[in-house]
Amino acid sequence: MLFSKKAKEIAIKKGVDFANETSELENHTFDIITMWHVLEHVPDLEKQIQELKRLLKPNGTLIVAVPNFKSYDANYYKEYWAAFDVPIHFWHFSRKAIKLLFEKENMKLEQVLPMKFDSFYVSLLSEKYKTGKMNFIKAFFIGLKSNWKAQKTSEYSSHIYILKNN
């Protein structure tokens, strides 16, 4: 993973230890790692998960937030759903997929939390993609309906997955 030169310069001036690549970091460095809408953009998924596992301390926590292709808004917008945006999104996840992917690396899915505001934002982006216009009102109601349906199905527009390194 490469970082911008400007971001690196600012970090160094503020006294932050900095590595250009995660491979430069020692094994079991972190108690917690967070990825907010990142994992779906990573080309080599298995390699990335192995690297996360390597970097986490034993019993460390990984927090991953990703879009959920089983949500109502994904089903409503179909090919216009913003999170299906290929090639920007390489991967599309469900709860089962996340569980299986990380179990292969001996990591346990501990908890799944909804990202309720994502349905509104993703619906707005999807409206723009579908119609070419930012239809705030329609996007709001589709986002609202997505969350309402998710109260019964637990399939929110995006989920936060909390995983433990075994």
Located regions from the model:
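Conserved SAM-binding loop
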Residues: 1-80, 90-104, 117, 157-165
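Short, Lys/Arg-enriched charge-dense amphipathic segments
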Residues: 2-5, 85-90, 132-143
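Short glycine/proline- and charge-enriched loop/turn segments
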Residues: 77-86, 125-132
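A C-terminal cap/extension of S-adenosyl-L-methionine-dependent methyltransferases
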Residues: 111-166
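A near-ubiquitous, low-amplitude feature marking generic local secondary-structure context
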Residues: 35, 81-85, 142, 146
